[in-house]
Amino acid sequence: MKYITAVPASAGLAVGTVRYLRHTQSGLGRAVRSPKEEQEAFENAVREAQDQLIRLERRAAAQDRDIFMVQRVLLEDEGLRQEVASYIRVGAGAAASVERAAGIFAGRIRALEDPYMRERACDILDACRRVVKVLDGQPHETLRLTGPAILVAEELYPTDIVTLDRSLVLGFITSAGSP
């Protein structure tokens, strides 16, 4: 038996099976095409990511639907799209451009005073991670729990949490903060 001690987000004790959620790395090493082709790939990936979010929103519980709508709106943000396009124009691949722009935008939002807005940084990273998955041809991971478990991850994103069967989640352990 292994004991894990951490800073609790709420009172209580959880004992159970541990399930690890490891987000796969993006395919930043793939060949970069022309800026025009990379921009087209980015636009197509955004549309596909938005379609995925619409499908998730339709299946989600009423209290969770806003998460998917917010992420769809974030993917339409003109500033984010221009930031991605600027990296593509100078020769970066679409996936690398999305990841870089997402990091910059998330950093700006984390610096805001409004706590609600700071929370949106995670939504930007989550939505952009979905776009990168589409660009890389990887399915977006969803964790399917088969029994009660403690979920361990470096970081949990909003869509990770709302797509889980919460009746099976005994607790969360993250190294990057609370979900």
Over which residues does each language-model region extend?
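Non-catalytic, soluble scaffold/interaction modules
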Residues: 1-179
